[in-house]
């Protein structure tokens, strides 16, 4: 079309055309075991292998193990060297979790869950004898992802997992489709559709060549049944599932086009993607739901050809990420001057919205984006983490997050966070104003790091961890936080780093906790906090909300919020509007259930002599890192590694080498996450110092801020513990250490130390005080070298045990 002669494809009045990219499956028969089967000829002929099935208008579940929840990795193929490429292409599984005898094993897919993303990789082979699965693709370049947080995963497309109503399996060699019917379904009335197409509408322009598709309107149409692609090597980790560049409605090089009253449903990839070279387009009153990946995507991961000036308005986008959990409800990549307004975005397994696609302070590629008047809720579902109701990246002048209602943002417990509004790496120059945020796992507002954003006139309520979190100290103003109300059930209003008041502005805020404990301002009283120059015109007072527990934050007429200049926030113009049937549409859909809580991890025990690999008995490789530890060497892995230079027993030990010029004074270091919450914990190890070794050992809990229990440090050839004179250490000889401490309700706030020096009787120091009286739980046990010069120390025979057999 052209400006003078636009083209419209529209439904006739009173009609609703439906375009399907699938084909009905017919010829069903019931097997003796109650499974229904049908033959899919295109599969038997080797022409296609669909990855979705919809039965009677509902998404059926590909047979998986387990049906709910996850399996856990047993370990890495090479646990001593995380950089070993084999660790990206496989892992050790717990005996019985997988089986090499499973049918069509190379069609099985392993879906690994990380913090903010997932991978979906095909199986290459399963070695039962070694309990190792080899994958047909790599998890990706990030070494953290090979076993993130214990390595959650599930197995999909496995015939042996066909054991729950609503599950299905497609046998590739025979073309036989197996389906376990849901209660109430009839084989004579089944309406089963398998998608064959990946894209249902494609606008194919070429902006760089000046070939633009323009002035086309689609109105009153429904598009359903699109499949998702599976490369031969699978889908490695990529944030926002951004590498899956396809959608049911997919556009490149498109301008001045409109999607109006369009429904996209039952599809496998993203719903709608206006990608490279798409500008001045509009989506209005569209319904996008039941997608395998994201809902609506604008722009791309590259900045050219430019995509800009697109509008998504009054749209209902929900129940997305059904297959690819790390995708987003509405995603704006390297794209500017877009508007997302009056939308309802709900039921995602990850973030509701994401804006920007550059990490750090590079020149902006996503600016002047407006996110306003949206209702964003029930995201995360405890499936992933490091997420937000609204999530941003990079320098973003002119970008506004304004007048949004955000609530029920829940992450997978145990690591990272879910925040209502999350300004991630480099987020700069944003305005965050007039938002209501409540019921989040972690924080109402979080800044990882960024510069000069304005946070004002917001309500942040009922976050489980903190109202406001600032994660990093930098030599500039992070943000101004003024005129906000922070409302909590607990006293922990602030989390993170707040020791540098010259680098942030906090004033004219109102704080309130419904609990009995006084509010803590990052471990300080309000008076101590104000003495730093913060919040001098702020109040601690009950704002007088009408019914905050049920989401009504209307202020009473005499609310003290008026004293800080707070402007009341109306929720009347948030979310969908129009005819009653459209506005009430969300009432027809149930919220997706949250993932079940993970099983409590078994308390970590360690028996590490640095001689052999526990799972196989193979020799521990020189240079290998300590098992089950997190190691930080600032990309110099040789600084912590197994060495044959010295040993307290056997032939090898662990060498920790400092070079004195790393970016962080506490590096190199490594730590374990024991998860000991009760009973008595014993740590024993041997160490050997050089004359100028400088290091410490600490036990910490997982609080924010954390509390320290037992601590010992070594410097100047001496060992220091609280309340005791320094103890001379022999240089170049091995010393034995034993620490015993009761935890949880049994804690006496003290610990015992036994020190075995060569040629001396064991020295016992009892009832040494914990560094913090609040310490009760061992979540972090670390060894840190803090020298400002080149030196080293050795460790051997690390033993960690607990009398508590379960957490």
Region spans (language model):
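Carbohydrate-binding surfaces in secreted/extracellular proteins
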Residues: 610, 685, 736-768
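Short glycine/acidic-rich loop motifs that flank beta-strands on beta-rich extracellular proteins
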Residues: 227-233, 268-274, 292-298, 321-328, ...
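Flexible glycan-contacting loops in extracellular carbohydrate-active proteins
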Residues: 763-794
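Extracellular glycan-recognition surfaces and repeat-rich motifs
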Residues: 616-655
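Extracellular polysaccharide-degrading/modifying enzymes targeting complex plant/algal/animal polysaccharides
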Residues: 1-265, 531-541, 550-601
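Right-handed parallel beta-helix
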Residues: 214-225, 255-266, 278-293, 306-321, ...
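Secretory/extracellular carbohydrate-interaction modules
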Residues: 647-716
């Amino acid at each position: 079309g052209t400006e003078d002669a636009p083209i419209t494809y529209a439904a006739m009045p009173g009609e609703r055309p439906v375009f399907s990219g699938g084909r009905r499956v017919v010829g069903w028969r019931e097997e003796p075991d109650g499974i229904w089967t049908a033959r899919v000829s295109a599969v038997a002929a080797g022409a296609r292998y669909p990855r979705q099935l919809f039965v009677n208008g509902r998404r059926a579940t590909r047979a998986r193990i387990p049906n709910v929840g996850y399996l856990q990795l047993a370990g890495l193929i090479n646990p001593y060297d995380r950089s070993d490429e084999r660790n990206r292409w496989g892992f050790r599984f717990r005996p019985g979790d997988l089986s090499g005898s499973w049918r069509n094993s190379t069609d099985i897919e392993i879906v690994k869950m990380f913090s903010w993303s997932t991978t979906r990789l095909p199986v290459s082979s399963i070695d039962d004898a070694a309990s190792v699965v080899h994958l047909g693709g790599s998890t990706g370049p990030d070494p953290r992802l090979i076993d993130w947080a214990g390595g959650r995963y599930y197995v999909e497309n496995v015939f042996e997992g066909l054991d729950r109503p609503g599950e299905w399996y497609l046998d590739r060699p025979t073309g036989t489709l197996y389906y376990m019917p849901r209660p109430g379904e009839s084989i004579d009335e089944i309406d089963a559709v398998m998608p064959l197409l990946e894209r249902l509408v494609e606008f194919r322009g070429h902006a760089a060549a000046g070939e633009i598709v323009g002035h086309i309107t689609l109105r009153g149409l429904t598009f359903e049944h699109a499949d998702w692609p599976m490369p031969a090597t699978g889908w490695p980790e990529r944030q926002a599932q951004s590498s899956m560049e396809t959608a049911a409605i997919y556009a490149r090089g498109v301008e001045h086009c409109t999607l109006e009253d369009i429904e996209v449903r039952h599809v496998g990839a993203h719903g709608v993607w206006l990608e490279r070279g798409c500008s001045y387009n509009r989506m209005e009153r569209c319904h996008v739901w039941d997608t395998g990946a994201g809902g609506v995507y604008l722009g791309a991961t590259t900045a050219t050809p430019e995509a800009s000036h697109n509008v998504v308005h009054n749209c209902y986008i929900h129940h997305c990420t059904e297959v690819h959990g790390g995708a987003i409800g509405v995603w704006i990549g390297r794209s500017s001057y877009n508007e997302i307004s009056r939308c309802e975005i709900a039921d995602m397994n990850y973030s509701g919205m994401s804006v920007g696609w550059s990490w750090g302070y590079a020149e902006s590629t996503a600016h002047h984006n407006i996110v306003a008047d949206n209702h964003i809720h029930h995201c995360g579902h405890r499936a992933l983490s490091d997420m937000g109701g609204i999530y941003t990246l990079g320098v973003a002048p002119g970008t506004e997050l304004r007048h949004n209602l955000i609530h029920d943002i829940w992450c997978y417990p145990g690591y990272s966070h879910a925040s209502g509004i999350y300004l991630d790496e480099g987020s700069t120059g944003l305005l965050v104003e007039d938002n209501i945020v409540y019921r989040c796992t972690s924080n109402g507002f979080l800044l990882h790091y960024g510069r000069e954003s304005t946070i004002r006139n917001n309500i942040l309520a009922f976050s489980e961890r903190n109202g406001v979190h600032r994660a990093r100290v930098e030599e500039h103003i992070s943000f101004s936080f003024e005129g906000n109300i922070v409302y909590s059930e607990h006293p922990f209003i602030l989390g993170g780093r707040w020791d540098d008041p010259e680098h942030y502005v906090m004033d004219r805020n109102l704080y309130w906790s419904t609990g009995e404990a006084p509010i803590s301002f990052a471990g300080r009283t309000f008076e101590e906090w104000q003495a730093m120059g913060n919040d001098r015109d702020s109040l601690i007072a009950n704002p007088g909300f009408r019914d905050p527990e049920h989401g009504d934050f209307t202020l009473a007429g005499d609310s003290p919020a008026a004293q800080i200049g707070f402007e009341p926030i109306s929720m009347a113009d948030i979310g969908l509007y129009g005819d009653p049937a459209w506005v009430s549409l969300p009432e027809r859909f149930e919220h997706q259930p949250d993932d079940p809580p993970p099983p409590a991890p078994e308390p970590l025990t360690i028996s590490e002599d640095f001689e052999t690999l526990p799972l196989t008995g193979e020799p521990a490789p020189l240079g290998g890192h300590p098992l089950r530890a997190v190691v930080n060497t600032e990309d110099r892995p040789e600084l912590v590694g197994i060495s044959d230079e010295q040993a307290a027993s056997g032939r090898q030990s662990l060498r920790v080498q400092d070079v004195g010029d790393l970016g962080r004074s506490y590096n190199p270091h490594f730590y374990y996450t024991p998860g000991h919450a009760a009973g008595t914990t014993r740590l024993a190890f041997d160490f050997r110092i050089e004359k100028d070794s400088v290091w410490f050992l600490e036990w910490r809990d997982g609080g924010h801020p954390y509390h320290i229990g037992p601590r010992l440090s070594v410097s100047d050839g001496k060992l220091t513990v609280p309340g005791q004179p320094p103890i001379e250490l022999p240089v170049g000889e091995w010393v034995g250490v034993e620490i015993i401490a009761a935890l949880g309700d049994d804690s006496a706030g003290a610990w015992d130390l036994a020190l075995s020096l060569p040629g001396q009787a064991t020295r016992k120091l009892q009832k040494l005080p914990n560094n913090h009286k609040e310490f009760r739980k061992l979540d972090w046990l670390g060894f840190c070298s803090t020298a400002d010069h080149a030196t080293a120390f050795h460790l051997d025979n690390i033993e960690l045990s607990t009398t508590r057999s379960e957490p």
